[in-house]
Amino acid sequence: MSITIILIFSILSFLLGIILSYVKYIFPIKKNSIIAEVDDLLPQSQCAQCGYSGCYPYAKAIVKNNENIDKCIPGGNNLKFKIAKVLNIKNIKYSLDNLNAKNEKNIHTTVLIDEKNCVGCSKCASFCPVDAIIGTPNFMHTVLQKFCTGCNICLLHCPTNCIKIIKE
């Protein structure tokens, strides 16, 4: 009795899977190619420094709501020019609040972990969206400055407040 029920549900699941995959090709979800192109340019760090929950919502806001293209701090000025090229924007205004436009450089951040207070819980490393924090549990962790975007997410999850961010 139980084998027949399992067999019936297995066959039913298989048939529904085939139907769903067939429906996917008949009614494809059409994505805006411009949004996808802008999203591909963004660094995908999901750091939320732009005020959006991730890179795709920010790309969607840029294309649909004419959001400023200079809010992505990890992307820097080069990203701003690439997005402007995709959107055919001719006059780009520099935003000195978010980017260091005069030197064509990103605002650099240095993240320091205090060795005395770090307990090696690895919470900062597990929440880092760009994997810039390395270390093993119960030992001191370190930050790879080259990859750190300064998003402050590690600060929120550190139980001992041993992480300091210095913006230069």
Curated annotation (Swiss-Prot):
Keyword Membrane: yes
Region of interest: Hydrophobic: 1-24
Entry's EC annotation: 7.-.-.-
Biological processes annotated in GO: electron transport chain
Binding site for [4Fe-4S] cluster 1: 47, 50, 55, 72
Cofactor binding mode and count: Binds 3 [4Fe-4S] clusters.
Domain 4Fe-4S ferredoxin-type: 109-138, 139-168
Gene Ontology MF terms: 4 iron, 4 sulfur cluster binding; electron transfer activity; metal ion binding
Residues that, per the record, bind [4Fe-4S] cluster 2: 118, 121, 124, 158
InterPro entries: 4Fe-4S_dom, 4Fe4S_Fe-S-bd, 4Fe4S_Fe_S_CS, 4Fe4S_Ferredoxin_RnfB, Elect_transpt_cplx_RnfB/RsxB, RnfB/RsxB_Proteobac
Gene3D superfamilies: 3.30.70.20, Electron transport complex subunit B, putative Fe-S cluster
Cofactor: [4Fe-4S] cluster
Domain 4Fe-4S, residue spans: 30-89
A single Gene Ontology CC term: plasma membrane
Enzyme kind, highest EC tier: translocase
Residues the record lists as binding [4Fe-4S] cluster 3: 128, 148, 151, 154
Keywords in alphabetical order: 4Fe-4S, Cell inner membrane, Cell membrane, Electron transport, Iron, Iron-sulfur, Membrane, Metal-binding, Repeat, Translocase, Transport
Keyword Glycoprotein carried by entry: no
Places the protein is found: Cell inner membrane
Subunit structure: The complex is composed of six subunits: RnfA, RnfB, RnfC, RnfD, RnfE and RnfG.
Family: Belongs to the 4Fe4S bacterial-type ferredoxin family. RnfB subfamily.
Function of the protein: Part of a membrane-bound complex that couples electron transfer with translocation of ions across the membrane.
UniProt-recorded name of the protein: Ion-translocating oxidoreductase complex subunit B
Gene transcribed to yield this protein: rnfB
